[in-house]
Amino acid sequence: MTTVKLTYFGHSAFHVEVDGVGIAIDPWITNPLSKTTLEDYLKNFKTDLVVITHAHEDHIGDALEIMRRTGAKFFSIHEIYVDLTQKGFQGIGANIGGPAKLDDVAPGLGIALTPATHSSYDKGVPTGAIIFKDGKALVYHAGDTGLFAEMQFIGELYAPKVALLPIGGHYTMDIEQALLATKLLRPEVVVPMHYNTFPPIRADPNEFKQKVESAGLAKVRVMEPGETVTFEF
């Protein structure tokens, strides 16, 4: 069994602890919904790796300061890797495809970058990311994305245990699109994200929960900023 502790900070910011290894994903800890200060985060959460799905400010967020303060490496698409290494940060660049083996971070750890339909300034393509442990797909963070057909392949290949999906619309999937994404991805648990941070992305996560669960697609866990849930897979 693998223990996964998932903490949500609002917007699309998460900390994922996999058997004691701390991974921050799109860590905009200081977003308007967050109840956690950056100092509290640094004090209470171990960060071994920072995953950046794309170059927009609300996803790079506090990543650079976290890396400066902790010495954590980052993982990203190659173009972000080039940009940040030129600024003195240590990281691992990858591209969309099979999982990168990150045994130097933790034995059995892997991350695969997936497509995402969005934008990323001039810093390569936007991505999602799947965290693996010993070949098992544990957590899929979709990044900022609209619905795309290849989600079916992610489901067929990996069926990630937990899917973190945007539901706010306007810039990403809305509730109806995220509902279909859940069907394609086949996760056990879905956590909605990227909603209610700003007026254009207002959405009701409980409406999403009702639609997904009434269709029998997955269990939906609506997380409050600052909440931590633990899974055993």
Swiss-Prot record:
SUPFAM superfamilies: Metallo-hydrolase/oxidoreductase. Keywords: Hydrolase. The keyword Hydrolase applies. The keyword Hydrolase applies. GO terms for molecular function: hydrolase activity. It holds the Pfam family Lactamase_B_3. Belongs to the UPF0173 family. NCBIfam families: PRK00685.1. This is UPF0173 metal-dependent hydrolase Igni_1254. It comes from Ignicoccus hospitalis (strain KIN4/I / DSM 18386 / JCM 14125).
